[in-house]
Amino acid sequence: MTNIRKTHPPIKIINHSFIDLPAPSNISAWWTFGSLLGLCLLIQILTGLFLAMHYTSDTMTAFSSVTHICRDVNYGWLIRYMHANGASMFFICLFLHVGRGLYYGSYTYLETWNIGVILLFAVMATAFMGYVLPWGQMSFWGATVITNLMSAIPYIGTTLVEWIWGGFSVDKATLTRFFAFHFILPFIVAALVMVHLLFLPETGSNNPSCLISDSDKIPFHPYYTIKDVLGVLLLLLLFMMLVLFSPDLLGDPDNYTPANPLNTPPHIKPEWYFLFAYAILRSIPNKLGGVLALVFSILILMLFPILHMSKQRSMMFRPLSQCLFWILVADLFTLTWIGGQPVEYPFITIGQVASILYFTIILLALPSISMLENKLLKW
């Protein structure tokens, strides 16, 4: 009798992606973040669905509806904080997943990598619009500042901003459309995830040594399903500790004040996971230049396959590139810290130096060091 998982068309696709998928025998815990991202997306969609049942996208009642969810709905506080902190966990896993891809040269799988970068943009757009929905002070002013960046686009900028706002300022129309987009985007993200996974079996998984592992493959189930379960349990432990013990640790106190267009908060800043890009934006005095630097700070990931000059794929056996990689990581931490600081001396200078360093490492230093390492191989 033939096995249903190998013959039934839809089940066969799942089987080839998660059960009988041939996986290298030496992949480390860094490869767990893909499945953890899937879990984060599932948590976000489910908690978001329950929140949407009670939320109202109207400027007069949005803030009150979130308060109502926390106070009156059964376990509403838990659902709300799981959704808010779930976004943070999502981005932690995303950054680690991308970092692993950079370290081990996974960007040489062009289709998978480029769809991954598009996914990153889609998730960032979703998170930004979600931050606007509670209609607190930081929601309102964050939406105003970030959407206003579009006005830097020549000729069509102002018209484009007013078109996004649905009026002459961030108001009811803006909130309603942001809620609509915030609701639909996660499902688009889920569809993109399917495409992302679809390209993976075409090339097979990468591995830490970056050597061809065709001669030594093992089935994904049970070996890596068990390994992923450990990652899931650890993630849920950290996640629930954050949600139950310090749910407001990563939030902004200003968002507990209802939105007031007449009162600007002293420091307007986005959520922590956007701070590195926000710091790059602020470090350039010109508005259009800042916007271009902001977009390019993420879009630069698509250039990695072109900038790869090394004869080796991974950084595992390239100590000089490793040093640069960890300097880049430290630089991103610095940018994140600077993004949350007021615009004054010495933070402006630190931000500018860190921004220049970020682009210099990626565009100049890494390719140059890779070419030097190629020479050293012959030495």
UniProtKB/Swiss-Prot annotation:
<dbReference type="InterPro" id="IPR030689">
    <property type="entry name" value="Cytochrome_b"/>
</dbReference>
<keyword id="KW-0472">Membrane</keyword>
<dbReference type="GO" id="GO:0005743">
    <property type="term" value="C:mitochondrial inner membrane"/>
</dbReference>
<keyword id="KW-0349">Heme</keyword>
<feature type="binding site" description="axial binding residue">
    <location>
        <position position="182"/>
    </location>
    <ligand>
        <name>heme b b562</name>
    </ligand>
</feature>
<keyword id="KW-0496">Mitochondrion</keyword>
<comment type="function">
    <text>Component of the ubiquinol-cytochrome c reductase complex (complex III or cytochrome b-c1 complex) that is part of the mitochondrial respiratory chain. The b-c1 complex mediates electron transfer from ubiquinol to cytochrome c. Contributes to the generation of a proton gradient across the mitochondrial membrane that is then used for ATP synthesis.</text>
</comment>
<keyword id="KW-0812">Transmembrane</keyword>
<dbReference type="InterPro" id="IPR005798">
    <property type="entry name" value="Cyt_b/b6_C"/>
</dbReference>
<dbReference type="InterPro" id="IPR048259">
    <property type="entry name" value="Cytochrome_b_N_euk/bac"/>
</dbReference>
<dbReference type="Pfam" id="PF00032">
    <property type="entry name" value="Cytochrom_B_C"/>
</dbReference>
<feature type="transmembrane region" description="Helical">
    <location>
        <begin position="320"/>
        <end position="340"/>
    </location>
</feature>
<keyword id="KW-0830">Ubiquinone</keyword>
<dbReference type="GO" id="GO:0008121">
    <property type="term" value="F:ubiquinol-cytochrome-c reductase activity"/>
</dbReference>
<feature type="transmembrane region" description="Helical">
    <location>
        <begin position="178"/>
        <end position="198"/>
    </location>
</feature>
<dbReference type="InterPro" id="IPR027387">
    <property type="entry name" value="Cytb/b6-like_sf"/>
</dbReference>
<keyword id="KW-0679">Respiratory chain</keyword>
<feature type="transmembrane region" description="Helical">
    <location>
        <begin position="347"/>
        <end position="367"/>
    </location>
</feature>
<keyword id="KW-1133">Transmembrane helix</keyword>
<feature type="binding site" description="axial binding residue">
    <location>
        <position position="83"/>
    </location>
    <ligand>
        <name>heme b b562</name>
    </ligand>
</feature>
<protein>
    <recommendedName>
        <fullName>Cytochrome b</fullName>
    </recommendedName>
</protein>
<dbReference type="GO" id="GO:0045275">
    <property type="term" value="C:respiratory chain complex III"/>
</dbReference>
<feature type="transmembrane region" description="Helical">
    <location>
        <begin position="33"/>
        <end position="53"/>
    </location>
</feature>
<feature type="transmembrane region" description="Helical">
    <location>
        <begin position="77"/>
        <end position="98"/>
    </location>
</feature>
<feature type="transmembrane region" description="Helical">
    <location>
        <begin position="288"/>
        <end position="308"/>
    </location>
</feature>
<keyword id="KW-0408">Iron</keyword>
<keyword id="KW-0813">Transport</keyword>
<dbReference type="InterPro" id="IPR036150">
    <property type="entry name" value="Cyt_b/b6_C_sf"/>
</dbReference>
<dbReference type="InterPro" id="IPR016174">
    <property type="entry name" value="Di-haem_cyt_TM"/>
</dbReference>
<dbReference type="InterPro" id="IPR048260">
    <property type="entry name" value="Cytochrome_b_C_euk/bac"/>
</dbReference>
<keyword id="KW-0249">Electron transport</keyword>
<dbReference type="GO" id="GO:0046872">
    <property type="term" value="F:metal ion binding"/>
</dbReference>
<comment type="subunit">
    <text>The cytochrome bc1 complex contains 11 subunits: 3 respiratory subunits (MT-CYB, CYC1 and UQCRFS1), 2 core proteins (UQCRC1 and UQCRC2) and 6 low-molecular weight proteins (UQCRH/QCR6, UQCRB/QCR7, UQCRQ/QCR8, UQCR10/QCR9, UQCR11/QCR10 and a cleavage product of UQCRFS1). This cytochrome bc1 complex then forms a dimer.</text>
</comment>
<dbReference type="Pfam" id="PF00033">
    <property type="entry name" value="Cytochrome_B"/>
</dbReference>
<keyword id="KW-0999">Mitochondrion inner membrane</keyword>
<dbReference type="GO" id="GO:0006122">
    <property type="term" value="P:mitochondrial electron transport, ubiquinol to cytochrome c"/>
</dbReference>
<dbReference type="InterPro" id="IPR005797">
    <property type="entry name" value="Cyt_b/b6_N"/>
</dbReference>
<feature type="transmembrane region" description="Helical">
    <location>
        <begin position="113"/>
        <end position="133"/>
    </location>
</feature>
<comment type="similarity">
    <text>Belongs to the cytochrome b family.</text>
</comment>
<feature type="binding site" description="axial binding residue">
    <location>
        <position position="196"/>
    </location>
    <ligand>
        <name>heme b b566</name>
    </ligand>
</feature>
<keyword id="KW-0479">Metal-binding</keyword>
<feature type="binding site" description="axial binding residue">
    <location>
        <position position="97"/>
    </location>
    <ligand>
        <name>heme b b566</name>
    </ligand>
</feature>
